[in-house]
Amino acid sequence: MYYIENNDKPRFLENMFKIIKIEGNKLILPLKTKNINKKYLVKLARKTKKILDKTKSKKIVLSKILKENEEYKNILYSYGFDIVDGKWLFEVISCEVLDYIVNLKNIKKEDTEISILVNYITQNTLENIKKIARQYKRLNIVTNHIEKFKKIEEELYNKEGIMIIVNNNKKKSLSKSKIILNIDFPKELLNKYNIYENAILVNIRGNMKIARKRFNGITINDYEIKLNNLDYSQINNKNQYNIRDIYEASFYKTMPYREIVKQINADKLEVTSLYGNNGAIS
């Protein structure tokens, strides 16, 4: 796994010959942040690929600045690189994200209706639903696959006494939910639902905006964390990377859920910020 960042003040020869510095498992690109030529980006991406092909590494973490460069990212994606974006971890810690929201907004858990929007079930998703249902007694699962989730609803109730409601009523399902956790609904599908106008919407997979004019709530698309038992200062000495990306990169995504949670608890993960369309929520 490699980290990639830019040097916005490269020396003349570094810039001219597009020399990529290699420092351990870190690549430093001679890339200024303004007026970047697309051809220059293509050449840098090709050089990046040549270097990483020799290492047989496909997983990469981009610095905050490089993540904003869609051209460079898309070229790397086209080469088949796995660019860590924090979304996998976002779902894994979704219960911690909900706790952060209720504490920040001074919301009582027992009075809060949570809705989870999900169509595709994974082991992590299932375990998270169980975890959230144990803490929030009013939990809706909104899905297009009613039959699949009805089986899960019955199994949770019969085996663990956990009660959830599975439904897909576009007019009523989200009309009273104070917090909505969107696991995998695309924007086009989400905007077909009648959403509580002051809801807090957490989008796990990517940036999204509610199209309805009457929606006055908060849309959360991003987050940051800290790890009280880990020190990333050697990698992130200039705060050029998101901690959540560095941390996600340390996991094998095929790890059993129990082992993932055990590691997160040992590292004392803490959600520090949630970001909406207009910056950090407060």
Language-model features, listed with the residues they occupy:
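Metallocofactor- and cofactor-centric catalytic cores in central/energy metabolism, strongly enriched
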Residues: 5-74, 277-282
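Rossmann-like adenosine-cofactor binding region
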Residues: 163-228
